[in-house]
Amino acid sequence: MKIKAIFLMNSIFFSIPLFAGSATCPLSNGINVHTTTQTLNICKHGTVIKTFKIALGYKGIGKKKAGDNKTPIGLYGLAHPRTSNQFKVFIPILYPTSKQLASGYTGRDVGIHGPTQLSSWFNWVNNLPSSTHGCIAVGKNNHIEYVANWVKANPGAKVLII
């Protein structure tokens, strides 16, 4: 009986931090994109270090083919951020994976990017819930610069889109 009580207490005390961290940071070291809340969390050791509101593809999630205007779901590598005249910074998501290619998925130029740079009149579009062609957009230049600097400082960084 004493062993059961100790086991029960241990499972209660030690499962709470694991569960709490896994809800916001299932990828404990990387970028976690939560499509239901439209948030991007940068996580280190299972702890959120920064959160940003995001916009996703205007046709929803579950990208399978080029031009479907959906945001892909899954775990992907991130390429080196690059300067973009259109979005300030563009961070390529390595979509599709080799497994997805083998399953017939198509598409390219999916990434995490900043607000449109066309005109300050159009920056509000990036704050709409589903305003991209399948990418993940943050609404402010300083936000994408923060994400890009984090990716540069963490070579081999990944993004989990769920």
Regions found by a protein language model. Name each.
Residues T51-K53, L75, D109:
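Well-ordered beta-strand positions in beta-sheet-rich domains
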Residues L40-I42, I49, I61-K64, Q86-V89, ...:
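Short, solvent-exposed loop/turn elements at domain surfaces
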Residues R82-I162:
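Exported/periplasmic cell-wall-interacting domains
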